Amino acid sequence: MIKGFDAEFSNLDHYIRVITDRIWEGRRIDDINRYYSSDCAVETPSSVSVGAKAVIDGTIATLNAFPDRRLLAEDIIISGSSEGAYLSSHRIFSPMTHAGAGVFGTPSHRIIYARTIADCVCINNKIVHEWLVRDQAAIARQIGSNEKELAQKWLDASGGYFKAAMPAAPSYYVSQIEQKGHAAKYADFLDQIFRSFQKINADHFYAQQIISALPGGESAVGQNQIMQFWQSLAGSLELSSFQVEHSVANEREGRPTAVAVRWRAKGIHGFSGRYGQPTGCSLEILGITHVEFQDDRVVREWHLIDDVAIWMQILSPRK
C-alpha cells in the first residue's frame, strides 16, 4: 500500500501501470478525471495545458488519429516519497496505425512505432503536474513526411510558434536531483556535452557496446555514433543555459541501474548541425533521457526530444 493512494495500489510503479492500462488501453477516458487533478499542468516541448479536460481532449484526438494505439511500459523510474510527492518517469513504446484524420493529416494507414516519456508528479491518488516528451519526428517519418515538413504544416495551421509559460510545480513537491552516484554522473555528463563537448572522453563513460535509441526512431550503436548525435545536437546551439531539472537512479536486483534525467537547454541556433544551417533564432530543447549503467558504464540510452517542436521554433515567422 502507498500512503494517500487507493488501497489497491501496492506502490507507485503499480499505480502508474494500472491507471495507464485503464485509461489508454481500456479506453476508460473518463477515468482521467479520477486520476488527474483539476489544475494539473502538462508541459510538452511545444505546448502547455492546464486541467484534466485538456488531457481528455488530447487523448481523444490521439485516439481518433491512431485508434489502436497501445501504451506499452518499457520502464518506470521512481523518486520522491509520501512526505512530499512522488515522481514517475514512465517510458512508453506505442505501436499504432495511422487510421484517422487529425494533426498528422490524412490517414496513411501505416503502422507506426514511437516512444514517449512522461514525468508525472503524483500525490493522493492523482497526477498533479506532468512533463511529456514524445518522438513526433518518428511519427512524421513513418507516415511519409518528415519533422521539418510537419513543423511547417503545424505552423501554417497555428499562425506561429506560441508556448505559454509552464506553471510552477506544487509547493510541496521538490524535484529530486541526486548529488552522487550514477544519476549525478550522468547529469554531469550532459552538462559537459552542452558546455564543453571537446573535453569529453567517451571511453570513460560509455561501454564499447553502447546502444542508444535516438529521436526520429533512429538508433546509435557504439561510442562513435552516439557522440556524433551529441555533437550534431549540442553543437547546433550557442548555449545560454543548461539545466538538469530532475535526476534519479533506481537500483534493481539482477538488473542494470536505471537512471532518469530531465533536462533543458536554451540558446541561439548559431551553428550548423542537426537542424541545418544556423538561423540565429532562439531555441529551447526539453529532453528526458533514460539510461542503464552496468559496471559503471552506460550500456543503454533512450533520448526523447521533439524535433518537430524544435523545427517549429526555427521556422516560425520572426516578429
Regions found by a protein language model. Give the residues of each.
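C-terminal and inter-domain tail/linker signature
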Residues: 1-319
